[in-house]
């Protein structure tokens, strides 16, 4: 699609009452996305823009998004370069992701939320106290770093969480995910041909709590299903 059409889609989604514009794995299209976002914002786009990424991105790419993206959803998949080389062919993953996430946090600052019916924004501490309320509370600005547990990689998951807590504390949210879904084609990695057990997940959550985590999202059972994998079928384009 053209940049002009992409800008139109952003505005159409806003008209349909979307809560945000979610750009998923858009790194290879950032120049076009930047121009489309500017066009859409000039045309009245006001809902938050979310950038959803593996974090294996050049810092200069992230810098081009400053002022256009409100919420970053980066992964932090690994610390261990042997794991990132084995499963993602990227021995430099952690170093690259480190720098990219640092830039994202610099741009957004601490997380902010909007509460339906209230004029002011609230911050993490108040959100954590109120997140069980019936009122709709939506993030408007900030970074949520996601970490997906992999079978047999609990030690690296602990290293990921420890790094994020030591580096950012309450400046970010951490989403600890148990939704790894083994699919066909894993014959080269038989150790990954299973789901994360409840015990494995609970051990990592306990570790995060022991390390003092307060800004976190966790998952309950039933998430490791193919239904959670989007259908990229061009609907709406």
Describe the predicted segments one by one.
Residues 66-80, 173-180:
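Non-cysteine beta-strand/loop elements that form the S-adenosyl-L-methionine
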Residues 6, 33, 97, 101, ...:
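Aromatic/hydrophobic pocket-lining residues that form the small-molecule binding cavity
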Residues 1-71, 80-81, 119-125:
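Conserved Radical SAM active-site core
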Residues 90-109:
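Glycine-rich S-adenosyl-L-methionine
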Residues 22-26, 50-54, 75, 144-148, ...:
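A cross-family glycoside hydrolase active-site/sugar-binding cleft signature
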């Amino acid at each position: 699609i053209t940049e002009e059409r992409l800008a139109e889609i952003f505005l159409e989604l806003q008209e349909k009452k979307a809560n945000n514009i979610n750009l998923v794995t858009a790194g290879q299209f950032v120049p076009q996305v930047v121009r489309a976002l500017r066009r859409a914002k000039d045309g009245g786009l006001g809902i938050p823009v979310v950038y959803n990424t593996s974090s294996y991105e050049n810092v200069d790419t992230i810098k081009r998004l400053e002022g256009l993206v409100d919420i970053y959803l980066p992964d932090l998949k690994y610390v261990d370069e042997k794991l990132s080389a084995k499963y993602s062919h990227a021995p430099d993953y952690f170093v690259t992701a480190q720098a990219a996430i640092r830039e994202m946090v610099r741009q957004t600052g601490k997380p902010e939320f909007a509460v339906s019916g209230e004029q002011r924004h609230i911050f993490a501490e108040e959100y954590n106290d109120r997140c069980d309320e019936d009122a709709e509370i939506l993030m408007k600005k900030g970074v949520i770093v996601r970490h997906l547990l992999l079978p047999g990689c609990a030690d690296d998951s602990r290293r990921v969480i420890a790094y994020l807590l030591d580096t950012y504390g309450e400046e970010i949210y951490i989403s600890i995910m148990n939704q790894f879904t083994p699919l066909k084609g894993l014959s080269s990695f038989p150790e990954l041909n299973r789901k994360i057990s409840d015990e494995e997940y609970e051990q990592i959550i306990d570790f995060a709590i022991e390390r003092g985590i307060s800004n976190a999202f966790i998952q309950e059972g039933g998430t490791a299903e193919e239904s959670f994998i989007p259908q990229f079928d061009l609907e709406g384009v």
